[in-house]
């Protein structure tokens, strides 16, 4: 299916790995020119080579830490005319209330929670001036299925869910759309590394990590490209009446028992 996205431009944060690069690839496959943002230049260079080698689109990269709002300003000044913004940067540490110090909590939220808010503030204004644009916030299932052992992440994602709904609810008045995606367990490098560490600790064999996937819906974690495909669909005009809502992609896990 042609999503009629060819020639548009998307800026994706957290774009060098996992859901970020999968989203960039799915958009590039539809002919979207992509701007990749993450903190590590080497990873960005690899991502650029990968996408440019597979798709006939323009690929630009910026190594920025988006917990610093000055870098958000730099991006908006350099790329004021983007059509699609995909917020994906940020990893919030696990742990209960006593395990996460104030400094760790604030640092994590500066990147993900306030990073998303700052990106939306700047790029929403630019899009509004042109009366068109789509913002897609990649959130996390912990925002709807609360977990005391991931309290900073659950609270942060819940806050961003509310933010996305509040902003997207009236975005149509400005010619824009704002939507969110709540991924469940997704087989990113980060998740696989965590599961290998757990398998080594529990079984003495990191290669048994896939055994932890069996309790998940359908007996597996989701694939990054399954999130990327939804990003492309939501970015397209096929989703022109979709705004102020959150799409959960977790195989049904939010309505089951514990994942692990």
Task: Enumerate the predicted regions with their spans.
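Alpha-helical segment proximal to the catalytic Tyr-Lys
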Residues: 125, 169-170, 240
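Short C-terminal tail/terminal secondary-structure segment
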Residues: 1, 6, 19, 145, ...
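Substrate-binding pocket helix/loop in short-chain dehydrogenase/reductase
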Residues: 96-97, 104-109, 212
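Conserved glycine-rich Rossmann-like NAD(P)H-binding loop of the short-chain dehydrogenase/reductase
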Residues: 30-46
């Amino acid at each position: 299916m042609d999503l009629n996205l060819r020639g548009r431009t998307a800026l994706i944060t957290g774009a060098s790995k996992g859901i970020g690069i999968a989203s960039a690839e799915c958009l590039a496959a539809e002919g979207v020119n992509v701007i990749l943002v993450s903190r590590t230049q080497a990873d960005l260079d690899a991502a650029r080579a990968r996408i440019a080698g597979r798709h006939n689109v323009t690929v630009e990269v910026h190594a920025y830490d988006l917990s610093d709002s000055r870098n958000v300003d730099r991006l908006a000044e350099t790329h004021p005319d983007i059509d699609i913004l995909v917020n994906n940067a940020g990893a919030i540490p696990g742990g209960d209330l006593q395990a996460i110090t104030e400094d760790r909590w604030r640092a994590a939220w500066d990147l993900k929670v306030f990073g998303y808010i700052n990106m939306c503030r700047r790029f929403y204004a630019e899009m509004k001036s042109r009366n068109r644009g789509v913002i897609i916030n990649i959130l996390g299932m912990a925002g709807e299925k609360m977990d005391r052992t991931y309290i900073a992440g659950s609270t942060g994602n819940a806050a961003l869910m509310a933010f996305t709904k509040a902003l997207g609810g009236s975005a149509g008045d400005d010619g824009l759309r704002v939507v969110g995606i709540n991924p469940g367990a997704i087989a990113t490098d980060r998740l696989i590394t965590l599961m290998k560490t757990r398998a080594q600790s529990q079984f003495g064999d990191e290669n048994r990590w896939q055994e932890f996937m069996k309790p998940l819906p359908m007996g597996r974690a989701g694939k990054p490209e399954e999130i990327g495909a939804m990003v492309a669909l939501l970015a397209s005009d096929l989703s022109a009446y979709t705004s102020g809502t959150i799409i959960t992609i977790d195989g049904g896990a939010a309505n089951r028992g514990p994942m692990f």
